[in-house]
């Protein structure tokens, strides 16, 4: 698996990338958007994926953390998150 895999399971959003698995409770997600900045605005954000120059950034904000997903297919990831 090279890319980021995002799926919903019960009350959680599950993000799998390489050997990492991150579970985010759906009710804790405050905002999801595309970030035009290369490295993201927030310095303490959890960065997932390879930050190549041509990748897009999907940002998931919760009350406790910000997650930046580096991906070449932001539309697919956004649709899985907001559906």
From Swiss-Prot:
Protein name per UniProt: UPF0457 protein YnzG
Domain of life where this protein originates: Bacteria
Naturally occurring in which organism (per UniProt): Bacillus subtilis (strain 168)
Entry's family note: Belongs to the UPF0457 family.
């Amino acid at each position: 698996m090279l890319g980021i895999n995002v799926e919903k399971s019960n009350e959680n959003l599950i993000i799998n990338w390489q050997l990492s698995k991150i579970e985010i409770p759906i009710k804790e997600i405050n905002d999801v958007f595309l970030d035009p900045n290369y490295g993201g605005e927030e310095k303490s954000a959890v960065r997932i994926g390879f930050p190549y120059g041509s990748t897009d950034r999907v940002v998931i904000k919760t009350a406790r953390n910000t997650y930046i997903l580096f991906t070449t297919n932001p539309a697919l990831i956004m649709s899985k998150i907001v559906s």
